[in-house]
Amino acid sequence: MTRTDFAQSAVASIFTGAIASHAAVLADDLGLFDALAKGKLRNRDLDRSPWLRNRIRISGALEALCRVGAVQRCTDGYELTDVGTELAGQVPVFRLWLGGYASVLAGQISIGADPATGVHGGIVAESSGAIGARYLDETIVNLLESLRPEGRICDIGCGTGARLLRVCRRVNQPGIGYDLSAKAVEAARETVDEARRIGVDIDVRQGDATALTQDHPDVDIVTQAFMTHHIAPDEYCAAVLRSYRSRFPRARYLVIFDTVPSQDSEEPEIFAPGFDYIHALQNMEPRSRGAARRMFTEAGYICREEVELAVPNSYAWVLEMRDREGPAS
């Protein structure tokens, strides 16, 4: 699947519709359909009471509905379309099955969320690993191999550890992974066992990227996989990244892989609508590509290389401490 296929695949409409279906229930709960039925909902109004306290969730719901043509952006806000008017009339059907039976739907998939994260960490780890294996890992492994690792690889946010194993096997170096989720670390046991069977030295531990306490002087390259956007605000994230210099005193590179928000997209798509909407429900505003680059600079890093990845709105950044020599990209 190419980048274009994420938007043009028939599955894109199914996925985007699933996200928008939940957004319709949320929009109704927040009173958005009633407000839009009266006319344009202006951005300046969303920044005032009664909307302000739910501003991020409101934006997430409106953007999800834009992708299915129920709401459209206008110069200074949002307005309901004919499809949106029809949807508003059918919202009780969505509320009945998606709202009234939400716990039944959730219960069919998993028996409980990870207390540390509030999400089903095992599902996140395994699904992310499968997405990575299909669309990302070969690019990432090639990128890390090009850096000619001279010691241990540390992967922060390693999930099941599958990518870490693949990297370490390719470059013939040991590895260590950290993940906040106990469920993810549990899922990684199988990967660690496989590594031992084939003679690759890797270990996976539970750990918080913002509170690492153990020094790893043998680590040459640190990777941080699709979780930097969870560390906020920017000043705090920059401080966390600076702390890695103490935790990994001999590391030559910090390589960050992450996803940034969509920019005014109105088309059905695989992956991106989920990223944008779920983070809005978590009251999070992931930083933009430009904001990420500025934050890396604030943290004391130079971006040596930026690679656009196959998953929409996703990038790899090869970072080096500013006091090291070499041209920046």
Swiss-Prot record:
CDD domains: AdoMet_MTases (cd02440). One of its GO terms (molecular function) is indolepyruvate C-methyltransferase activity. Its EC number is 2.1.1.47. Involved in the biosynthesis of the antibiotic indolmycin, an inhibitor of the bacterial tryptophan-tRNA synthetases. Catalyzes the transfer of a methyl group from S-adenosyl-L-methionine to position 3 of the aliphatic side chain of (indol-3-yl)pyruvate to yield 3-methylindolepyruvate. This is Indolepyruvate C-methyltransferase. Belongs to the methyltransferase superfamily. Strongly inhibited by the thiol reagents p-chloromercuribenzoate and N-ethylmaleimide. Partially inhibited by o-phenanthroline and 2,2'-dipyridyl. Competitively inhibited by L-tryptophan and indolmycin. It catalyses: indole-3-pyruvate + S-adenosyl-L-methionine = (R)-3-(indol-3-yl)-2-oxobutanoate + S-adenosyl-L-homocysteine + H(+). Keywords: Antibiotic biosynthesis, Methyltransferase, S-adenosyl-L-methionine, Transferase. It comes from the Bacteria. GO terms for biological process: antibiotic biosynthetic process; methylation. Optimum pH is 7.5-8.5. Loss of methyltransferase activity at pH 5.5 and below. It is an enzyme of class 2 (transferase).
